[in-house]
């Protein structure tokens, strides 16, 4: 079997994904990733390659352990890693590796098509990939949970409001809780919508590709939109897997 292992260390958790060619066969999430938790994967699968990526500080000890545990080559994703897309960002050394990976996956899924890539995680990133497979740039703002939390932490009286798919989000809240919820949710939807409209004008973008922990929630709040929205929960992992295979062949 042709298995590859993708390790994506995010801001608040780590995601481990096993691929058979381009198909996801197993996904695991960890709060804090340790080598011991990866042992069952190495025992279960005969891997042909591993890729490790972190948006935070590189875990050198983990990388060393990975190389000790498997004979498969381990690719550590950096800003110097060869990519199947062109990055025209002015400061590529500061560009989040997760944003790069999501863009790579979007190009693979929608070749020669300009798309808006939205990753709704701890932070909300909204990036443009043009029809020539170029990462053009994008925006970074607080994610949903961070917005709710900041209103609670940086004010004297506003409560911490929870959110779920079933919650109503009126245009204008009728009490403090709904005012906060509607302000945050409608605000973030308006932010995405405005970015899409601008990307459509500038790059003929016709599709939003949505991923991240809050992507399912946001899709439910944008269901009445006329925009074409595709949700891919494993977008970053798919991009990292594509980068791994690209480097195997180059």
Where are these regions (language model features)?
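Nucleotide/phosphate-binding catalytic cleft detector across ATP-hydrolyzing
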Residues: 1-13, 17, 24-115, 132-250
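Short beta-strand-to-turn element immediately C-terminal to the catalytic PLP-Schiff-base lysine
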Residues: 19, 127-130
């Amino acid at each position: 079997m042709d298995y590859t292992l993708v390790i994506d260390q995010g801001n608040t958790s780590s995601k481990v994904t096993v691929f058979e060619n381009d198909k996801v066969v197993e996904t695991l999430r960890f709060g804090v990733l340790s080598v011991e938790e990866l042992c069952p994967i190495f025992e279960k699968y005969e891997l042909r390659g591993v890729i490790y990526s972190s948006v935070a500080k590189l875990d050198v000890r983990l990388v060393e352990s990975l190389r000790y545990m498997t004979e498969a080559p381990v690719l550590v994703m950096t800003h110097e890693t060869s990519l199947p897309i062109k990055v025209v960002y002015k400061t590529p050394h500061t560009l989040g590796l997760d944003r790069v990976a999501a863009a790579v996956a979007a190009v693979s899924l929608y070749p020669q098509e300009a798309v808006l890539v939205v990753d709704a995680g701890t932070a909300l990133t909204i990036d443009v990939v043009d029809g020539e497979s170029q990462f053009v740039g994008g925006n970074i703002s607080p994610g949903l949970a961070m917005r709710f939390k900041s209103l609670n932490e940086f004010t004297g009286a506003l409560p911490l409001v929870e959110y779920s798919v079933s919650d109503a989000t009126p245009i204008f809240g009728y009490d403090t809780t709904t005012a906060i919820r509607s302000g945050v949710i409608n605000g973030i939807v308006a932010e995405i919508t405005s970015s899409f409209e601008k990307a459509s004008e500038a790059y003929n973008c016709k599709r939003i590709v949505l991923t991240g922990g809050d992507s399912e929630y946001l899709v439910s709040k944008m269901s009445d939109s006329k925009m074409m929205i595709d949700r891919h929960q494993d977008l970053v992992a798919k991009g990292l897997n594509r980068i791994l295979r690209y480097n195997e062949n180059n």
